Amino acid sequence: MKKQKEYHPSMQPYLDGQVILFDKPLKWTSFDIIKKLRYQTRIAKVGHAGTLDPLATGLLIVCTGKFTKQINDYMGMEKEYTGTITLGATTPTFDLESEPTNITSLENITAQKVLDATAQFTGAIMQMPPMHSAIKKDGQRLYYAARSGEIVEIDPRPVTIYEFEITHIELPVVHFRVRCSTGTYIRSLANDFGAALGVGGYLSSLRRTKIGSFAVEDAMQIAAFENHIAALKGETDTKL
């Protein structure tokens, strides 16, 4: 059994178990948040309830101690996202992790066509996950195959889109809000949405705003968490 590192007495609540809401910054991985928390608290038993891609921001639920047993429960909750889809091009990763290609004219695309296209992506649908994803096929994560140029047959997966609302259109950019089931890839939704319009599309920004009843408005910034931990340690040291 891995030995728990020495930790500051004020970190006992984190050792026992906490549920912390973070607002993940742009370009941080979800595991970067875990590493930061482990470094600050010296608590090893830490996990998050649902990966956010590096180019996404927003709500990340992090659990410590006994609450790591509830991670699967949090992961199963419905999610809400806001973001933008850029029409008229595609990318291999379905987002801006790779360069846009297949540039297409939008001269025949109207706001009404964009609004009408949401109907086919609402309700229970079969969704093809991106090749650049952590899903495993025959024991190998898909992104390894994608990076090596290997062609892998992927099976579509059932997901549910409870709401798909277009909030603003300024072509080529379409702003949206989505409420969906766990397992939904918003990158795939963006790619499929562009394909349905016949012009291609990719996810150009994404923010997770809700997980179940948890909201990003209640989440903590990384700097605020660091200051909070420093204050806890300082208060305890003063009393000792």
Question: How would you label these PLM feature ranges?
Answer:
Residues 1-240:
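Catalytic/RNA-binding core of pseudouridine synthases
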